[in-house]
Every structure is written in C-alpha cells, then in structure tokens.
Curated annotation (Swiss-Prot):
One of its GO terms (cellular component) is cytosolic large ribosomal subunit. One of its GO terms (biological process) is translation. Belongs to the bacterial ribosomal protein bL35 family. One of its GO terms (molecular function) is structural constituent of ribosome. InterPro entries: Ribosomal_bL35 (IPR001706), Ribosomal_bL35-like (IPR021137), Ribosomal_bL35_CS (IPR018265), Ribosomal_bL35_sf (IPR037229). HAMAP family: Ribosomal_bL35. Gene3D superfamilies: 4.10.410.60. Keywords: Ribonucleoprotein, Ribosomal protein. It comes from the Bacteria. This is Large ribosomal subunit protein bL35.
Amino acid sequence: MPKLKTRKAAAKRFKVTGTGKFMRRRAFRNHLLDHKSSKLKRHLGTKAVVDERDSENVSLMLPYS
C-alpha cells in the first residue's frame, strides 16, 4: 500500500497537542485593527482548539500527526 500524502496547506495551519487535539489560529487579526480593542487583539493572538466536529477532517488531511 502506498504512503499517504499530507496536505501541506493543512500542515502549515494546524498543530497537534500532546493529547491529540488540533490547534489553530484565530481569524480577524490580519488587517483593519484600528477600531479593535487591545484586549480583543491580544485574545485573537492566542491559539484556539479545533472543534471536535472538524477534527476528523483535519486528521484525514494530516495522516501522520
């Protein structure tokens, strides 16, 4: 059986935790930041856990994680 290919776009966007969960970046922090509060921008800088309903799709894209 051939090796499974990793989707490189997904590999750059998601990281796996020690417990097997996937971490992702938050949206809304690329531009148009003037009107957003410092607290919001700081919160958007943290990582978020991928929802368990989406984790299955992410794990299919990253077969060796």
